[in-house]
């Protein structure tokens, strides 16, 4: 396929018409890239237009830099062009990809085409999303530093010279940030002498003296972190560049820095803003305590940058999972699982953080049940019910909270078959549940072998009876569960029959004083509802949290997985990464510090 410019120069005189039909205002010398008049961004010396790559069929960013302020003559133009040629060879996950570049000498402009980021710049993204966790800011910082370290590792080092949040670009759907706007980047010259270029608020003191190296980028990065944390532009208290210049060369830090009350965050920023002789390199900053995973993360919302505000990441993940239950099909189903458990499995570190903050027992039950299976007390183990069926060990443990709640955990280990095991944790309602309904619900939603249902129910009965004195087990199993169905039973044409509304939670509003059946009603009727074809509630609700592990004889290596009974039992297990390193995936974030990408829907 020929590009627009290639068609223009084919000698048939139709070039102008073809260019107009494509809607381009300009094309590159090869005819591959076309520029539209739509402006995506504008800086002091650069304008970014929306462009199109005809060969790949994707939109790109067409950057146009005016060289009249940075190019003095033909010799410097050639030298600058050579540097840009080397920049085109940069390939790093933290650097915006440069696809093509060329100098338009008659117009004294440098054009370069880069990948397009639909989420815009980090400054725009942060303004749109004013409340983000400290963990998110740390991940952004780590990616930016990684990109800077890559630039500075070249020989000679590449200095960005204009690093700021406006020149850092975001892929919001993947949580990735990349350093862009390399139009002013330069190689460090011998003796450290260079031109004074950049944005005054982000320029290091030595830049004003025109004697700087790659550490000037680290200073600019520190100002970026300050803006990320406080949502304030550095030196916003100043009204003109002269005031900024006087403060910078006098060593006066931005006023926003003194509103950062978190000592770790503030110390990290101050390290970046230190005098050049004491300023660490980008690679060194990657080991700073601020970038290490913490058990308790706060939030940065521009309210002083304290990074706390009363909520930690454990609480946040618990509440996020609790609130983001799958929506019901009908309006009268606008209810979640009532807080019996989060919708996604919560990692140990999340729940540990909740324990350290002193949350109530209702938030800690998953961790407590999990810990019961780690106990080595022989007497305690002997007191728990155990069963071995066809090479499968089944153990049940539980506890009763001060408010009377009963929480159980069922450990199923197949030592003769796949060698895999699972711990299923759930809450048992002694006033509404029976062991058989819960066991049937578990089998239906978690794909447990049918022949184990009766034995599972017996184990549940025995454990609940041990935890709740005077509690009487319910009936083993019969058709009584069908009484939970509304109307004409199996007759789909009967009023209120299965076809119309086969369980209490799905019945029409007219059949009840409440438009949504109680959660207890649903929990006790879900299994029966599924047998009668009502898959809406059975698939969209659930109480079970599941932990998988490798069932070894003497040792278990457990791996949390982000699934619950809400997913209909579709589990994706994480395999062992070795005894010395175990990676958990919580809310799409690998806990070893890496960020996992996700496919767009």
From Swiss-Prot:
Catalytic residues, chain numbering: 181 (proton acceptor)
Start-end of Basic and acidic residues biased regions: 572-583
Pfam families, per the entry: Pkinase
Compositional bias (Polar residues): 560-571
Presence of the UniProt keyword Kinase in the record: yes
Reactions catalysed: L-seryl-[protein] + ATP = O-phospho-L-seryl-[protein] + ADP + H(+); L-threonyl-[protein] + ATP = O-phospho-L-threonyl-[protein] + ADP + H(+)
Name this protein carries in UniProt: Probable serine/threonine-protein kinase WNK3
Organism name: Oryza sativa subsp. japonica (Rice)
